[in-house]
C-alpha cells in the first residue's frame, strides 16, 4: 500500500512505478469534450458503469451536468473499464476518480484551465509523443519536461495549458 503525502512536493515529479505495455490499437477513441472541436480524443480507463462509450466520462462535467440536470463528480467515475488492466496495481491502491487515456492530434490543445482543488493530484503515464518537439505543458509559469513511458505526479492547484504539435 502507498503511504506518503505527495501534496508537499513540487509541481511535477517523476514516480518510480512499473512500466506499462499498452496496445494502442486496442483502445477505443472518442472525442474528448465533444462540444469543443479540438483535435483531442480519449479512451476511458474508469467510468460510471465500466462501459467505455466515453459518455459522460470524456465530457466536461460542468457542461454535461448542466445539460442533463445531473450532479456527477470526478469520484463518481471509479468503475474500471476493459482498458484498466495495465493500471490495476494503481487502481487497487488509490482512490481514483475519472481516469482516461488522452490522445492529442496535431494542433490539439487544452487552453489555460484548472481542473480541481488543493486536495487533488494527477498521476500521469506518458506513452508517446511527449518530447519537447511534440508537446508543450506550461504550468505555474514553467514549461514542464515530460518523457515517453514515464510516470509523473502533477499538482492540480495550478492553472495550466497543453499544446501538441
Question: Positions of the model-derived regions?
Answer:
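Non-heme Fe(II)/2-oxoglutarate
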Residues: 1-93
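Intrinsically disordered, low-complexity regulatory regions enriched in Ser/Pro/Gly/Thr
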Residues: 93, 116-118, 165
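A short glycine-rich, His/Asp/Glu-containing loop-to-beta-strand
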Residues: 86-106
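Catalytic core of Fe(II)/2-oxoglutarate
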Residues: 126-165
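Short, conserved beta-strand element in jelly-roll/cupin
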Residues: 103-105, 116-132
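Structured loops at beta-to-helix junctions and adjacent beta-edge loops in soluble globular domains
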Residues: 40, 48-51, 104, 126-128, ...
Amino acid at each position: 500500500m502507498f503511504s506518503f503525502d505527495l501534496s508537499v512536493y513540487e509541481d511535477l515529479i517523476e514516480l518510480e512505478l512499473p512500466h506499462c505495455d499498452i496496445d494502442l490499437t486496442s483502445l477505443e477513441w472518442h472525442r474528448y469534450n465533444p462540444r469543443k472541436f479540438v483535435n483531442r480524443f480519449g479512451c476511458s480507463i474508469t467510468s460510471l458503469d465500466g462501459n467505455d462509450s466515453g459518455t459522460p466520462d470524456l465530457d466536461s462535467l460542468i457542461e454535461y451536468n448542466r445539460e442533463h440536470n445531473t450532479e456527477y463528480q470526478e469520484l463518481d467515475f471509479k468503475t474500471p473499464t476493459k482498458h484498466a488492466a495495465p493500471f490495476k496495481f494503481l487502481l487497487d491502491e488509490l482512490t481514483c476518480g475519472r481516469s482516461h487515456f488522452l490522445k492529442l492530434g496535431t494542433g490539439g490543445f487544452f487552453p489555460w484551465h484548472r481542473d480541481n482543488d488543493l486536495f487533488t493530484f494527477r498521476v500521469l503515464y506518458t506513452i508517446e509523443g511527449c518530447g519537447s518537439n511534440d508537446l508543450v505543458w506550461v504550468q505555474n509559469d514553467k514549461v514542464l519536461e515530460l518523457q515517453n513511458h514515464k510516470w509523473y505526479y502533477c499538482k492540480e492547484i495550478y492553472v495550466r495549458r497543453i499544446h501538441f504539435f
